[in-house]
Amino acid sequence: MRHNIKFKSKGTLKIRNTAQISLWKKCSDSMIADQTYLFINRVQDRRFDEESLRILELSLVAMNVKSFLEVRSRLRDFMRSESVVIFGELTGESMVAKLSVLEFFARAFALLGDMESCLAMRYEALNLRQLKSPSCLWLGVSHSEWTKFAVQSMENGFPSIAGKASENALLSLKKDSLIEPKSEDNSDILDAAEKVRRLRDSAASLTSSHSGIFIYIVSSLKFAVCNRLLTTF
C-alpha cells in the first residue's frame, strides 16, 4: 500500500539532535545536504509519502562515492532509531496507516541498501495482516505472497526467515486445499506445496550451516524484537 500517511507524533518534532546535524554537515554539496536534511525533517514530521522517498532517492543518487557510503550509513542508523519511536506512536491508528508506514520504511531501507531492515518491515507487515485477517478478510496473506517473501529472504542471505515464511506459505496452501479439495486447482496447490517444501528444506539446511549460524541468529533476533514491538498494534 502506498497511501500518503501523516499522523500526529507524540514527541517534539522540531528539535534536531547533534547526530542529525552532523549527518547534514557530512554532505559536501549544499544541494545534497539540503535534500538529505529535508528527508530527515519529513520523517520527523511523519510525512511517509512518495515525495519523501523521492527526496531520499535523489539525495543518494547525487552523492559521490565517499559521501554516499558515509551518509547512507548514518541515514540507516537514523531510520532504525526513528522506526522504534514511530512504531510506538502507531497504537490507535488505522490498519491502513500501520501497513503504509511499514511499507514506507521497507522501501526507504531498500533505497539505503539495508535489506535486513527492509525484509524485517515486510515480514512484520505480512504477520500483521495475517493476525488481523480473521476479522478483516481483505487483509489475508496468500501463499504466493509468503513464497515470494521466502525467496527474497533466501536471495538476500536470510534463510532462517525464509524458513518461517515457507512454513506460513504451506499453512496457507493447506487451507486452500481444504476449501477446494476436489477442484481442478487442487493439483496446482499440490505442485506449489512441493516447491515450497523444497524451499523450506533448503532454508533449513543453510540455517544449520555452522559457517553462517551467527548471522542467522542475529537476523532472527532482530525479527523477533521487531515482532514483539508490533504486537502492541
From Swiss-Prot:
Specifically expressed in buds. Keywords: Meiosis. InterPro entries: DFO. It comes from the Eukaryota. Disruption phenotype: Reduced fertility upon self-pollination, producing polyads with an abnormal number of microspores during pollen formation. Meiocytes are defective in homologous chromosome synapsis and segregation. Homologous recombination is severely affected during meiotic prophase I. GO terms for biological process: meiotic cell cycle; meiotic DNA double-strand break formation. Required for meiotic double-strand break (DSB) formation, the initial event for meiotic recombination. Interacts with PRD1; this interaction facilitates a binding to PRD3. This is Protein DOUBLE-STRAND BREAK FORMATION. It comes from Arabidopsis thaliana. The gene is DFO.
